[in-house]
Amino acid sequence: PAEHAIRGLRGIALWVEDAAGTAQVLSEVLGHEPGPVEGNRSRFVHPGAGLGRIVDLRAVPGFWAGAMGAGVVHHVAFRAADDAAQAAATAALAARGIRVTPQQDRTYFRSTYFREPGGVLFEIATDAPGFAIDEPVAALGSRLMLPARYEPHRAAIEANLPRLHPAHDTA
């Protein structure tokens, strides 16, 4: 039912060897405000309303770093209102000696990527142009939309996706 639909994530938890550099990037570059500290967990909150504003940062010396595989998160994405906000973040990162990828056009948004000092891969993605560039807002999520470069591979992509059964689907 719609009342049980996933509408977003409350926040994320990052476990890093040394949290100091990550904390600086979160607060000085990405605009998160330091919040309460409990033991080895420091909370950072992005100002404003909505989901995805909380980052819980844990300093866990000696913790085994993640390895790619099923169930492992590849990267964490943060929002940038537009190209100018993304460029400002990129400049702030470069001033700290952090290498950032060139901007990547992902059709629905534009992204840059960097490894923050704790080793986690971060993405900064623009809000624009948005997911309504190739279908009406009312139709979002009703069928699989693909960027033009992936359309030739639609059959193979769809063959590898599990069938979803939306609440309104009686099949």
Predicted regions mapped to residue ranges:
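Short hydrophobic/aromatic beta-strand or adjacent loop that forms the aromatic wall/cage
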Residues: R41
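Short secondary-structure boundary/hinge segments and terminal tails
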Residues: F44-V45, S111
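Short acidic/glycine-enriched loop/turn segments that link adjacent beta-strands
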Residues: R106-R110
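Glyoxalase I/VOC metalloenzyme domain signal
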Residues: P1-E38, H46-T101, R115-A171
